[in-house]
Amino acid sequence: MKNYKVGSGLFCLFCLSLFSSCEHRVETKTIVREDGSLDKTIVLFTKKSEQETKNYFGIGAKQGWEVSVDSSQSAATSQWDSSKSKNELKYTYSFSKSFQSADVSNDELATPSDSLFRLTSKFEKKFRWFYTTYYYSDTYHAINRFKLSANDYLTEVDFQFIDNLPAEGKPITKADSLFLNKLNERIFDHYANRAYFEEYFQLLIGLANAAQKEKLLKHQESIYKLLFEKDSKLDNDPWPSLLDSLGIGINVSSAEYRTRKTWAESKFNFMSWASEGKYKHTIVLDGQIVKHNADSVAGNEFYWKPSYLKFAFKDYTFFAETKKPNIAAWVASILVLLAVAWGLRRNIWK
């Protein structure tokens, strides 16, 4: 995960294969039609190849998306924040698809999964006689897939700070910068370390017999400290020697262990990828603007550049609401008023 650190250099190397993603960019755009149909585009800027078939959105040509790939650096250095990393993002993958409704989109992009990015869309159209209002939202589901709750490591003040973070790239005060550094330290040096350990520990518990389970639980805290102490002499893959030293004969080369480990690693790799991303989200919704929570607006295009922290531990919703006049209703109302006025005038003349 981003800035992932552990006390033991050896254990860090062991984790590196799981938490080894590099910075990348994700741009998502939705054009909303009056009938609720959607045109969605998801663009990935990355150093990695083969993302057209293997990506954390689970989308591709097989799922009916129109896919285009550009491996030139110029494509990856489009209008974005000026940074050194722009020249390193060599691949651009663009995925486009039209959906009849938000529900159809959700069937594909919001399916529950521990190893995929989940995006839920919502569209509401309400008739108000003189106006019709249009509400649209996209929700990024929390990227934290650890079973360990973060509430024991983060306070309400921390979550309020995250909620108030400005768009990515916007300046923050020195005090806020110091607070953010400390927050990241608690997230990655404390919460992520413990959560990562608990996932593997529970994996071993699931494979242990009664006697082995008792030993594991008895030595749980000492195992944790040993894994993260600075001068640990463990191998890069510490579990075999650790279990052997405790006399716990769990076979970590078994097919069942490898299967469970692969499942866990797919979840960890997703979290690592998601936390390293730079995000830009766009909603296009015609009409007179009523309300929104966008970072910026140009015409009827609403833009967000959220920090990954916005949706690290809880869902984050981007929304916009507009309205359009109902011409027929206005004309009908005017005709009714004219008819009433004409009737009153005739009565007065009588």
Region roles according to the model:
Residues 2-9:
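Bacterial N-terminal signal peptides that target proteins for export
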Residues 9, 38-40, 291, 312:
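Residues in flexible loops and secondary-structure boundaries
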Residues 18-21:
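C-terminal motif of bacterial Sec signal peptides marking the signal peptidase cleavage site
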Residues 23-85:
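Start-of-domain marker
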Residues 72-337, 341-344:
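Mature, soluble, non-transmembrane domains
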Residues 346-350:
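Short, charged juxtamembrane terminal tails flanking transmembrane helices
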